[in-house]
């Protein structure tokens, strides 16, 4: 039947072509007759196309053909000797997930371990000799065609906490992307990174002093992002975020809410461009505002500029690469008797000189937010080895010159390992 239908379709196409390309017949009646024939052929063609679709649907629903050499239905129904009959049992379902359809509803689950060792003295920011710094469990899944969910739990020696947990709506009009839950803010570059993504063992001094340390600006709120059309191959995106108003703790506290109206806000503008086939440049502007621990009438404002340069030659991509990162942050903190204006920055570079080896360095400088006349400086040299994409071993020498003539020399060792399907982090 399929072959017959295809022959009919080809015949109709040939007849239609002949009718169109044939010699013009004089007379209005003959022309009208030809036009009527063309319309009839078109109607028949449409009808045959419908029949072909019906045949295809029936073929898809038909049972699979019996393989050559397989027993026929009559043969399979023939009685067999009792001694040759084996008991056939249904396959046993192991685990509580059931079939593949049920397993598809389970999220991707991963665990990342972060073990750190310290050698050397640091009376300003002391650390234990050995510690399981943080273990992170991630659960990520597509919720429905309109949203996805992400949860990250952190397990440390001080307890368990929700690092991030949010739903992202990705199918909104006008290319808006909305995120609701607890999340790291889009301020700068380092603040949005989890510990295992950092190219160093620690975070820069400016992050610890001005942007809330390891936790950073991480709060419950709403984030709205949109890609802005821009010419000349420039990727431009804008993000606005509204948070409850609590970020950081202790000496690293940035914002603190005293009443429901004491919310904090964050804005970020990002521009990205490929300079050539091997190099790209990523620039960002950031702003954050919230109330500090002194009360509702005292506000802290942060301003930031970040830049990232990436180089990865296509022909030697697995052997050589370079990433340069830098952030500049200004802090305005209202407190008695005077407002404190602090500045901090870091500049770092990481060069891949072998398939699994990376060598990097970082320079740090940061004023203290509550005493801007005190400035801390430092430098680090970092060597990283990646046995595979699921683990990394890193050593870092860190020199810090704290305000008040306190100098420290430390050696930091880190082992990171990953289990399970961990989703990609923002580029």
Language-model regions, residue ranges each:
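Outer membrane beta-barrel
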Residues: 91-248, 261-266, 270-280, 343, ...
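Bacterial N-terminal signal peptides
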Residues: 5-15
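Detector for outer-membrane/organellar transmembrane beta-barrel domains
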Residues: 278-369, 377
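Outer-membrane beta-barrel "beta-signal"
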Residues: 224, 305-307, 383-385, 407-427
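Sequence/structural signature of outer-membrane beta-barrel proteins
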Residues: 116-122, 156-158, 187, 243-252, ...
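Outer membrane beta-barrel transmembrane domains
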Residues: 119, 337, 350-352, 356-400, ...
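N-terminal periplasmic/intermembrane-space "pro-region" immediately following the signal or transit peptide
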Residues: 19-121, 414, 424-427
